[in-house]
Design a protein with these regions (language model features):
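Conserved donor-binding/catalytic core segment of Leloir-type glycosyltransferases
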Residues: 216-233, 239-242
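Carbohydrate-associated surface elements
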Residues: 171, 193
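Short hydrophobic beta-strand element within catalytic cores of glycosyltransferases
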Residues: 322-325
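Aromatic "clamp/platform" in nucleotide-sugar-dependent glycosyltransferases that forms part
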Residues: 305
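Conserved acidic donor-binding segment of nucleotide-sugar-dependent glycosyltransferases
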Residues: 337, 341-348, 357-362
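Nucleotide-activated donor-binding/catalytic signature segment of Leloir-type glycosyltransferases, i.e.
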Residues: 265-285
Length: 397
């Protein structure tokens, strides 16, 4: 099968970007021919699948096709431009280039099916080709739909003409039905898979990994967070929880926060205000560094106010790290008391208590083993690809 995949973001730095890259790799490895269209603002390394990056203007861009940085629903490590900031001309230019490149690549690549990421502009571009297409709803597109009505005609037209719509969690599925009025028999929940070759239990030196991050003192415990530094990610709640667990626990606890975003400076000021001496902002980390981070952590946290799915939680579990998250969005679909804990949103006291409970458990080794096995058995890309292939076939016949 020849599959053309379109996304709104680069193949790194966002959940949908990582999803798109992994999807393209996995489909290629089992014999499909794949090409991916995606925005970029710098050169990209070769992959095993074909690519057509659309070059946007970044901080260091020289050759670009469109004179502003690629827009996001929230933020991206390489762009703080949002869809909501685009003026009428920029919005028109964005839609035009997405449609034009999709039509050009459909003509050249001649795909059997198109897989659009997000119910936003890419499904609209896909329907312009007249080819069958499916779309995956990642959750941030739902935020965008609620926030900016200018995009409604495009998002709705693309959604309503899709042969099938994939949703990534129960909550995302419910909201997709409410906002886009897509029939039940067109929607299918397919949980995201993770890269089993990359995210796994490793025998690493805590001392060496910390030194790579510029931290020389080895603590008794490590708490990790990985994600965008945006309001919906709830990092401010984690910092307030850190104030509590640092005070209550006699042993030294280090909190490592990986990621960039619009709230970086604001969160650093909050850390200083709370006088957190053992909390470190690592900035953007690559996938290999993320694996190391999870492997040295005792607990990984996802304190989000809303989390469409929570791939970072799956990746942490795959590395044998229990996860403490919030009971909103996609996290309740898979976090249970055998591998972690769920707490109420914006409850720093409950978050701190859940983290402390994980740290003092007598069965931590068994719990880490369970976390890894749970991720492998339930969220491998092998399982995800089987579901996606089935949806492609349903959409074609």
């Amino acid at each position: 099968m020849k599959i053309l995949i379109i996304n709104h973001f680069p193949l790194e730095g966002s959940g949908s970007g990582v999803y798109t890259k992994n999807l393209a790799k996995e489909l290629t490895e089992i014999g499909h021919k794949v090409k991916v269209i995606f925005p970029e603002n710098r050169m990209v390394p070769l992959e095993i699948f074909k690519m057509r990056p659309i070059m946007f203007r970044g901080d260091n861009s020289k050759d670009y096709e469109i004179d502003f940085n690629f827009p996001c629903f929230t933020s991206h490590p390489r762009s703080n431009t949002t869809f909501y900031q685009l003026n009428k001309k920029q919005m028109r230019d964005y839609i035009d280039i997405m449609v034009r490149v999709t039509e050009e690549e459909a003509e050249k690549f001649k795909p059997d099916i198109i897989h659009a990421q997000h119910l936003w502009i890419t499904p609209y571009a896909a329907q312009k080709t007249g080819l069958p297409y499916v779309a995956t709803v990642h959750g941030t597109d739902l935020k965008g739909f609620k926030q900016d009505k200018r995009y409604h005609p495009y998002a709705l037209k693309g959604a309503q003409n899709a042969r099938r719509v994939i949703t990534i969690s129960k909550q995302v599925d419910r909201e997709t039905k409410e906002l886009y009025h897509i029939e039940d028999d067109k929607r299918k929940i397919v949980y995201n898979g993770y890269d089993t070759k990359l995210f796994k239990v490793k025998n690493v030196s805590r001392k060496e990994i910390l030194e790579k991050f510029g931290i020389n003192e080895i603590p008794a415990y490590i708490i990790s967070f990985a994600g965008k530094l945006a309001h919906f990610k709830g990092v401010d709640i984690l910092l307030k929880a850190a104030k509590i667990y640092e005070k209550q626990m006699k042993e030294k606890i280090t909190t490592l926060i990986a990621g960039n975003g619009v709230l970086y400076e604001e969160l650093k000021k909050l850390k200083d205000f709370l006088k957190l001496k053992r909390t470190f902002f690592l900035g953007h980390v690559n996938q290999d560094q993320l694996v190391d981070l999870y492997n040295i952590a005792d607990v990984s946290t996802v304190p989000s106010r809303s989390e469409p799915f929570g791939l970072v939680a799956i990746e942490a579990l795959a590395c044998g790290t229990p996860v403490v998250g919030t009971n909103q969005g996609g996290l309740p679909d898979f976090i249970n008391e055998d591998i972690g804990a769920l707490v109420n949103v914006e409850d720093d006291i409950a978050l701190a208590e859940a983290i402390i409970n994980e740290l003092i458990r007598p069965d931590k080794k068994e719990r880490r083993n369970r976390a890894h096995e749970y991720a492998v058995n339930n969220f491998s890309w092998e399982n995800t690809i089987k579901e996606v292939e089935k949806i492609y076939k349903e959409a074609l016949f």
